[in-house]
Design a protein with these regions (language model features):
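The canonical alpha-helical register within tetratricopeptide repeats
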Residues: 63, 99, 133, 168, ...
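Pentatricopeptide repeat
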Residues: 39-43, 73, 77, 93, ...
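Alpha-helical solenoid repeat scaffolds, predominantly canonical TPR units
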Residues: 60, 96, 130, 165, ...
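C-terminal interaction modules of eukaryotic adaptor/scaffold proteins
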Residues: 402-452
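N-terminal targeting peptides
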Residues: 1-144, 156-161, 178, 192, ...
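Inter-helix linker motif
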Residues: 68-69, 103-104, 122, 138, ...
């Protein structure tokens, strides 16, 4: 589209220069850029393009800000703050915040992004300082802004510091239920589950009823520890407190039980969920299909897909189809898997991804169906605009070497390198051995040069 070609044009010019100022000058000097009408959409797309390249992002941001008839929205400033913070350019981020403040553009969203980036860069004291200076941004210290700070600290593993700050603030800022849920999450993240339980009691002391999120956070902690007796205790407590677990809680437990090889127990819990009147959703059924497939209960998984989901009025998503395709391929039903792929292609809402195709590619390599392999790769790239990642290239190169298709494998190897995807040592080594066996000495030399 025209919009996309404008993005590509500016992006190409924005890569010239070693500093934001140089990039700004190179864009300002470009006659072709003078005719571009800058819009919010264009700026958003450019910032997204340069989310990992702060110099180009800031150069483009400054250039757009100087264009006649255009003024940055607060959202564009927030994106820029986030990019600078993510790339640990804290001085530049502070300067931008000061500029925003002069123009009265700082919102709580801005503050949240800046706090998170300060904490992520190990500067949690700066996040606290930002909260202390909220008044200078024309913002209030209230439960919402306090929660932002506490959440930021807890997510960076600073729950003790968050607690000390909360004890200082709670005399003049009233906490809400979310405040306590933040701490429950923070204590669990720090492996201090007793404190999380204690926070449940503290919550009740403040006249807040623990909700599904409060309990589910602790349940997730116990699931990760494979402490399922505690999980069941909490499920009983939730029901006794009139706060029944929801489908997300059940799905989490079921997945962890299956991962711990407790498949039967996981399936029993699905029955408990249904008996409790808890309605299944798409992620629940996706997990169930995956678990049944892994347990070798092929027909039951097919029944869930073909009968249970439609009967429950639950729609399928990409993940549902991906699980089914992987399972069908694993059991050698490639034609059925292909018909599901075609069904996805003709049904509107589905966005196919790499996971849709990889089991099929693997099956082609296993059965030696090179025509189908070629067609699938063609569909991936041309029909669905999907690109292969390092593991997909490795799968193909290894498989093609085993299938005696060295020339094709080497072609993919070259394609991979041209895209700046660095192959693993094993991939290079295997390809090298195979081409030597075929007396492809020129090719072998090129691979050896690359491996140096």
């Amino acid at each position: 589209s025209r919009n996309q070609s404008t993005v590509n044009l500016v992006a190409a010019k924005a890569r010239v220069g070693s500093s934001p100022d140089e990039i700004l000058l190179s864009l300002a000097d470009e006659q072709v850029c003078d005719n571009i009408e800058v819009s919010n959409d264009l700026v958003d797309k450019l910032l997204l393009r340069f989310k990992d390249d702060w110099k180009s992002a800031l150069g483009v941001f400054r250039w757009a800000g100087l264009r006649p008839g255009y003024k940055h929205r607060p959202e564009a400033y927030d994106m820029m703050v986030d990019i600078l913070g993510k790339m640990k350019q804290m001085d530049q981020m502070r300067e931008l915040l000061e500029e925003m403040n002069r123009n009265h553009l700082v919102t709580l969203n801005t503050v949240g992004k800046a706090m998170r980036r300060f904490s992520g860069a190990g500067k949690w004291e700066d996040a606290v300082r930002m909260f202390d200076e909220l008044g200078t941004f024309g913002l209030e210290k209230n439960a919402e802004s306090m929660n932002l700070l506490l959440d930021t600290l807890c997510k960076e593993g600073k729950v003790e510091q968050a607690r000390a700050i909360f004890l200082e603030l709670k005399s003049h800022i009233l906490p809400n239920a979310h405040t306590f849920n933040i701490f429950i999450h923070g204590w669990c993240k720090a492996n201090l589950v007793d404190e999380a339980h204690w926070t449940l009691q503290e919550m009740k002391g403040h006249a807040f009823r623990p909700c599904v999120i409060s309990y589910s956070t602790i349940i997730l902690f116990y699931c990760r520890q494979h402490n399922f007796s505690k999980v069941y205790e909490l499920l009983d407590e939730m029901e006794a407190q009139g706060c029944p677990p929801n489908v997300v809680t059940y799905t989490t437990i079921i997945v962890f039980l299956a991962k711990s090889q407790n498949t039967e127990e996981a399936l029993q819990l699905t029955q408990r969920m249904k008996s409790a009147g808890c309605k299944p959703d798409t992620p629940f059924f996706n997990s169930l299909i995956y678990i049944l497939g892994r347990a070798g209960r092929f027909q039951e998984a097919v029944d869930v897909f073909e009968k249970e989901m439609p009967n429950a009025g639950v729609s399928r998503d990409t993940s549902t189809y991906n699980s089914m395709i992987a399972m069908l391929c694993h059991h050698g039903h490639v034609s059925k898997a292909l018909s599901l792929l075609r069904e996805m292609e003709t049904s509107a809402p589905f966005k196919l991804d790499g996971q849709t195709f990889y089991p099929l590619l693997k099956s082609c390599l296993r059965t030696g169906d090179m025509n189908l392999l070629s067609q699938l790769l063609d569909d991936m790239v041309k029909k669905h605009q999907l690109s292969l990642d390092r593991s997909a290239y490795a799968l193909l190169i290894h498989g093609l070497c085993r299938a005696n298709k060295c020339q094709w494998a080497y072609h993919l190897f070259e394609e991979m390198i041209s895209k700046d995807i660095v192959p693993k040592y094993q991939t290079c080594h295997m390809l090298l051995e195979e081409v030597k066996l075929k007396s492809m000495y020129d090719t072998a030399e090129k691979i050896e040069d690359f491996m140096k």
